[in-house]
A protein has these predicted regions:
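ACP-dependent fatty acid/polyketide chain-elongation machinery
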Residues: 1-67, 89, 247-257, 354-368, ...
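Glycine-/small-residue-rich "gating" segment that lines the acyl/pantetheine channel
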Residues: 124-133, 174, 178, 194-251, ...
């Protein structure tokens, strides 16, 4: 059977850089950092005291106050991003065939704040017997965001959550892409969400020595591909891409941001947290996405890398790019928007996919900030264009987004300019 073409017709985002796609994209191009001291809890006894929090968000602008209390923060962010995306795509919900519209969101951890609150409450009152909130489980579980999005809009199509740590929302986008091109849906609200800036979240990642502890200079802590990088910066947020079958989009006169043309998955099969030192899984997943898209390395103008600012991960990803792209690696732009957003965990792929879509649409590459000229790692080839510190204008025919998760999960998607 001939596969259907899939385009992006709507965007939504709630990030540490802004509470919608426009604010987020503008801040990216300006090279702003979302990092600041943590405000959600007392960090006195924590080694990492800063993160990239979502700021100045009035949840009740989107969700009824009573309903919002029944949702973990990650679900609130997911729902807000989806509301933005559905509005942006301009679909007439009164006329839409809601049986052909689905929801696939990626979530890496889920309701960790809810878990903390309920278990903490139980620990204080366990002598009186269990007294759990009836919303404890529905608030906590990782699949519930997709459910709430479908309930909000009455979408009866495919509905589920993908969980593959930091690759979760890229897997969601890739899965939604396949469902549409196989004819199983006309439109899918896809993306991801995460809200793990909690005592357990920050404490757990700190115990793994995964987080930066540059507490005296949070804004400059996330510095991918610099020698002085010392770990990632926790972030939170959500991103939404409305994926739609091309003819369906054209029939309703939808605006088209870009075309999604390929996706790939692979496994490192190496270590539960560390990436393969030679970038094996990263190489495989990028090749899989290129093959799926029918593209060659020289067709890619921009790679939004996983680039978390960790000592091992950044090096292995660069190795994979050089191995696979060869001479073409030195002609394209590379950047890590995590230098600005922090690491959004399960939401990272969705927000970074949005950055790729907007790069393709606008012919501009957001920067990798916080690099200093003399801060070079001898294992990294600086002949590559990492788009350090300043956005760069160039033609972007196609953009590739990498995400890699604990467990060795790798996912990749490719967007290109839409043409008839």
């Amino acid at each position: 059977m001939e596969l259907k073409r899939v385009v992006v017709t709507g965007l939504g985002a709630v990030t540490p850089l802004g509470n919608n796609p426009e604010e987020t994209w503008k801040a990216m191009l300006e090279g702003k950092s979302g990092a600041a001291p943590i405000t959600y809890f007392d960090t006195t006894n924590f080694k990492a005291k800063f993160a990239c929090e979502v700021k100045n968000l009035n949840v009740n602008d989107y969700i009824d106050r009573k309903e919002a209390r029944k949702l973990d923060r990650y679900t609130q962010l997911a729902l807000i991003s989806a509301i933005q995306g559905v509005e942006d795509c301009g679909i007439d919900l009164e006329k839409a065939d809601k049986n052909r519209i689905g929801v696939v969101y990626g979530v890496g951890i889920g309701g960790i704040k809810t878990f903390e609150e309920e278990i903490g409450y139980y620990a204080l009152h366990k002598e009186d017997g269990p007294k759990f909130n009836p919303f404890f489980i529905p608030k906590m579980i990782a699949d519930i965001a997709s459910g709430h999005i479908s309930i909000r809009f009455g979408f009866h199509g495919p509905n589920f959550t993908t969980t593959s740590a930091c690759a979760s929302s890229t897997n969601a986008i890739g899965t939604a892409f396949n469902l549409i091109r196989l004819g199983k849906a006309d439109m899918i609200v896809s993306g991801g969400a995460e809200a793990a800036i909690t005592e357990a979240g920050v404490g757990g990642f700190t115990a793994m020595h995964a987080l930066s502890t540059r507490n005296d200079d949070p804004e400059h802590a996330s510095r991918p591909f610099s020698a002085s990088r010392d770990g990632f910066v926790m972030g939170e947020g959500a991103g939404c891409l409305i994926l739609e079958e091309l003819e369906h989009a054209k029939a309703r006169g939808a605006k088209i941001y870009a075309e999604l043309v390929g996706e790939g998955e692979s496994a490192d099969a190496h270590h539960i947290t560390a990436s393969h030192p030679e970038g094996l899984g990263a190489n495989l997943v990028m090749q899989a996405a290129l093959d799926d898209a029918g593209l060659k390395p020289e067709d890619i103008d921009y790679i939004n890398v996983h680039g978390t600012s960790t000592p091992v991960g950044d090096v292995s990803e660069v190795k994979a790019i050089v191995q696979l792209f060869g001479d073409s690696a030195y002609k394209l732009n590379i950047s890590s928007t995590k230098s600005m957003t922090g690491h959004l965990l399960g939401a990272a792929g969705a927000v970074e996919a949005m950055a790729c879509v907007l790069s393709v649409q606008n012919n501009i590459i957001p920067p990798t900030i916080n690099h200093e000229e003399d801060d070079k790692d001898e294992e990294i080839d600086y002949n590559l264009n990492f788009t350090f510190n300043k956005a760069q204008k160039r033609e972007v025919r196609a953009a590739l987004s990498n995400t890699f998760g604990f467990g060795g999960h790798n996912a990749c998607v490719i967007f290109k300019k839409y043409a008839e």
